[in-house]
From Swiss-Prot:
Its cofactor is pyruvate. This is Phosphatidylserine decarboxylase proenzyme. Belongs to the phosphatidylserine decarboxylase family. PSD-B subfamily. Prokaryotic type I sub-subfamily. Pathway: Phospholipid metabolism; phosphatidylethanolamine biosynthesis; phosphatidylethanolamine from CDP-diacylglycerol: step 2/2.
Length: 283
């Protein structure tokens, strides 16, 4: 009953307005406001500040600046093996596996289509997926899982339902309903996609090459083509791609049949860290 009420209230909320108000508050550089919000978040979400490069909260210019904090150097070691695909984020590996009949697993007994996720009937050769949920206490920067060249970026406007165990099990096509940013890369295994999924109270999605894109900065689908000769945006595995200002979800799509996850496919809700081995590229 409580779960259904929680979902119903989210349908009534003005998602975009709520997230914009949160964004404005989170960007405030008023010392009293931002320090209070940071202390509140640390206590509420049990944030491990010891891992942060900057542990003095007074040094953060805003609440958002704190939420996209950097980690201490070498805290998340990464494999140099080119055949290892790394986790792009700290969080929980909620679902992963093979894309079957153009469908991905959202939660136990609940599927959604690849076509609806990327808002295109051209689903290329995507065969595997991994979904990582970032809670408010997690490190919020998103890193490149494999060496690659940026070819395209697509912004898809949508709702901003919260993302958690309740909504993933109750809201149909949650990840295909929410606002999202899809970044396509050319890699040694073919095309991959790194998808930033927005959520309620997420005060923004930013990339290192474009800047802030969400929430709801555009009313229609927007596409940026980086495949022309004037662009040559390359990333090494582990490089920072962008970040969330609060928390949400990252979905990775990979091509081909030579990707094998390092976990059993009947596992889910696995705690994972950025740069940790996620999958292997097999011969």
């Amino acid at each position: 009953m409580r779960d259904n009420l929680f979902i119903y209230l989210q349908y009534l909320l003005p998602h975009a307005l709520t997230s914009r108000l949160v964004s404005k508050l989170a960007d405030s550089e008023n010392k009293i406001i931002k320090n209070h919000l940071i202390k509140l978040a640390i206590k509420k979400f049990n944030i491990n500040l010891v891992e942060a490069k900057e542990t003095d909260i007074s040094k953060y210019k805003s609440f958002n600046d704190f939420f996209i904090r950097e980690l201490k150097d070498d805290l998340r070691p990464i494999s140099n093996d080119k055949n290892v695909i790394s986790s792009p984020a700290d969080g929980v590996l909620s679902q992963f596996g093979t894309i079957t009949d153009n469908s991905l697993i959202q939660a136990k007994g609940k599927l959604f289509s690849l076509e609806s996720l990327i808002a295109s009937s051209s689903t290329t050769n995507f065969t595997k997926f991994a979904t990582i949920y970032l809670s408010p206490k997690d490190y919020h920067r998103v890193h490149m899982p494999i060496d690659g060249k940026l070819t395209k970026m697509v912004y898809i406007p949508g709702k901003l339902f919260s993302v958690n165990k309740i909504t993933t099990s109750k809201v149909d096509n949650l990840f295909a309903k929410n606002e999202r940013l899809i970044c396509y890369f050319d890699t040694i295994i073919g095309e991959i996609a790194v998808i930033f999924v927005g959520a309620l109270l997420v005060a923004g999605i930013e990339t290192v090459w474009h800047g802030k894109i969400a929430p709801n900065y555009y009313k229609d689908i927007q596409t940026w083509d980086y495949n022309s000769a004037k662009f040559n945006i390359k990333f090494n595995k582990g490089d920072i791609l962008g970040w969330f200002n609060f928390g949400s979800t990252v979905i990775i799509l990979t091509s081909g049949n030579n990707v094998s996850f390092k976990f059993e496919e009947n596992q889910n809700n696995i705690k994972i860290q950025v740069n940790q081995d996620l999958a292997l590229i097999t011969e």
